[in-house]
Amino acid sequence: MVHHFEPRPIPGDVLDRILESALHAPSGGFSQGLALIVLDDPDQLAWFWKTTGGNDFGDPPPVIVLPIPDKRAYLERYSQPDKGGPDGPFAVESGWPVPYWDLDAAMACMVMLLKAVDEGVGAWFFGIFEGQAEVLETLGVPDGLRPIGVLAFGYKAPGDRMEGSSVTIPRRTFGHLVHRGHWRTD
């Protein structure tokens, strides 16, 4: 992930290809319950950073994207006859053992992160830990919806390098990741 960005803008066609890639991410029942709010105006970006506690991570990106899943699209889709109908288990939120609206939004984020790399654009995913209510209200996000995080896009600044836990904590081994046939504790 890139934390230090050049100030130069991303050409519109490049940014559009990154954003469009989200349309090709998995979508449970083809519910397509995802919206992307794109902020690329310098004044809007300055407001975002001020509202959310600043950009003390490095040089700010020229574009941020808020991926906002909409569970209502999933509940509506899964109340259709081919998905169990209005009385089926997935027609209500409590019927979902995992909130697929968030999962699908996360997969769309991963697709956009990978497309950014393909386009030569640096990227980073982070969370909003301060000011989220004000961000949602100011951007006109409907009640009950919230972003799963924020994607930052821009060209990597010279000298950007991994810092913090990415450098100090060793990556887990393949053997600790993969459990074949059953859960291992060793």
Map each language-model feature to its residues.
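A short N-terminal beta-strand-loop micro-motif at the entrance of redox/enzyme domains
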Residues: M1-R17
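C-terminal helix-cap and adjacent tail motif
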Residues: M1-V2, Q80-K83, I148-D186
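Small-aliphatic-rich amphipathic alpha-helix that forms the alpha element of a beta-alpha
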Residues: A22-L23, V65, G85-T138
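Glycine/small-residue-rich phosphate/adenosyl-binding loop
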Residues: F30-A105
